[in-house]
Amino acid sequence: MIFITGDTHGDWISRLRTESFPEQKEMTKDDYVIICGDFGIWDNSKREKYNLDWLEDKPFTTLFIDGNHENYDILDALPVKEWNGGKVHFIRPSVIHLMRGQVFTISDKTFFTFGGARSHDIRDGILEVGDPRIKEWSKDPFKLFRINHVSWWEREMPNVAEMDEGIQNLRKINNEVDFVITHCGPASTIALYSHGEFKPD
């Protein structure tokens, strides 16, 4: 079995507890929950580690791609391993980050993974640690800003190497997969289906 959700932002317990997700009673570690970005790797706090241990103890395997709200300093420091045909980071033995531009075979289906997205909650800018405006702006509920390497990472957007690797991996399988897992679709596609509501950056 495979279940897909998104944007857990580190709150795995409320989303994936048995009361919210009773299907897990029939699941094993050979069944999967895929989280489509904004998984919630954030600060290595005791609470986050506790929650990850809780997730590891669930009967299923958790897979996730990155979104625009992840701590890329933590993710990028992890060793790169191979799993089911593609590159991954193991957060726990059964909590696995599926890296960008990869093709995985999971439950006899092929999945192309490409995480990342551009943050839209940064209208007032990206500030550096120590910027005196942080204290003042933090009190203003209308200020939309982030702090570099604290609450925002440039790595939220894919780089050319990741895009090239994705193209190469897709070519190896004649550009055919069963599923594409992404945090945010291409701007051109979103614009097409939004009936004029979506305004690209």
Task: Pin down the residues of each PLM region.
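Active-site-proximal loop/helix segment associated with metal-binding centers of metalloenzymes
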Residues: 109-196
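Extreme N-terminal starter segment of soluble prokaryotic enzymes
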Residues: 1-3
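Core catalytic region of metal-dependent phosphoesterases/phosphodiesterases
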Residues: 5, 10-106, 199-200
